[in-house]
């Protein structure tokens, strides 16, 4: 079912979003080369229980580009502008990959608005020098041939063993990614390259944090993320045993099941600290 798309102005330009369902508010933030429709399966399932807002982050989907770099703070402020326009004060943010970087920037800037966050194949650490060089090379590739770069990048985010099973999902994600403008891609690469460490945000968070980790994630190694999870005070860790960097497409049922559990536990009036580790095949 096609959802009604709405727009707000942010710094004089357009931010596109959808808003469906009733109840406590959950905001889904896509990753690099994504858009709000990447969440369609997740949104359809979760909106039966919660109010689900999806956003096209700057430079993606139908939202505008800004300047020469989309820093994570800019992304966070675009989300805050939308939530303020909807008069929403408390919510949970779910951020996939780059969306997780934006989520942590939001948590640093606006912690009082959060009831919890989920880092969906994401990290609190800044790029290593090697990774920064990779992004610089990627910018050159995009300027030379954005289509080839985009299709290959998306395909490589899935676990190799899932490429046949998830052929339709790979094609779906590539189709979305190919709509991203060259400027949007470059600005996002620049913004991710410049982001700082935000481990302190995770360590001192006064709300629960969920991490969803893929055993075969080619971008963020499983063990590094598991080690990172040790700094979280109240946590819900989901390990996807057969998946890569696109768990919501590779294993949607498991992700939806555990997201619902995390949301309900996070939204309890007198919640206790969580220490949950779940494993899904």
What are these regions (language model features)?
Residues 243-252, 256:
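Catalytic histidine-centered segment of alpha/beta-hydrolase-like enzymes
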Residues 1-26, 47-50, 84, 89, ...:
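Alpha/beta-hydrolase fold catalytic core
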Residues 88-128:
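Conserved hydrolase catalytic core segment
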Residues 205, 211-213, 217:
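Short beta-strand/loop motif that positions the catalytic acidic residue
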Residues 9, 13-68, 72:
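Conserved HGGG/HGGXW glycine-rich cap/lid loop of the alpha/beta-hydrolase fold
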Residues 126-133, 144-204:
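Conserved alpha/beta-hydrolase catalytic His-Asp/Glu region
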Residues 74-91:
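Conserved acidic catalytic loop of the alpha/beta-hydrolase fold
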Residues 226-245:
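Catalytic histidine neighborhood in serine/cysteine hydrolases
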């Amino acid at each position: 079912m096609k959802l009604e798309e709405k727009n707000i102005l942010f710094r004089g330009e357009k931010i596109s979003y959808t808003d469906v369902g009733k109840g406590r508010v959950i905001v889904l933030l896509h990753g690099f080369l994504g858009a709000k429709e990447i969440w369609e399966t997740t949104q359809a399932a979760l909106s039966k229980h919660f109010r689900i807002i999806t956003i096209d982050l700057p430079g993606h989907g139908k939202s505008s580009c800004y300047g020469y770099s989309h820093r994570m703070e800019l992304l966070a402020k675009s989300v805050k502008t939308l939530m303020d326009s909807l008069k929403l004060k408390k919510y949970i943010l779910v951020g996939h990959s780059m969306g997780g970087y934006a989520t942590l920037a939001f948590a640093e800037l606006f912690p009082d608005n959060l009831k919890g966050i989920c880092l969906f194949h994401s990290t609190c650490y800044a790029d290593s020098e090697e990774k920064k060089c990779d992004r610089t090379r990627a910018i050159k590739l995009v300027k030379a041939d954005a289509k080839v770069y985009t299709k290959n990048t998306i395909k490589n985010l899935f676990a190799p063993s899932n490429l046949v099973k998830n052929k339709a999902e790979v094609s779906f994600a590539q189709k979305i990614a190919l709509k991203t403008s060259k400027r949007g891609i470059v600005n996002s690469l620049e913004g991710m390259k410049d982001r700082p460490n935000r481990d302190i945000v995770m360590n001192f968070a006064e709300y629960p944090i969920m991490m969803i980790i893929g055993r075969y994630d080619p971008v963020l190694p499983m063990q590094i993320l598991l080690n990172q999870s040790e700094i979280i005070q109240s946590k819900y860790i989901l390990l996807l045993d057969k998946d890569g960097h696109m768990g919501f497409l590779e294993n949607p049922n498991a992700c939806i099941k555990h997201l619902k559990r995390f949301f309900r536990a996070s939204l309890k009036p007198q919640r206790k600290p969580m220490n949950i580790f779940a494993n899904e095949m």
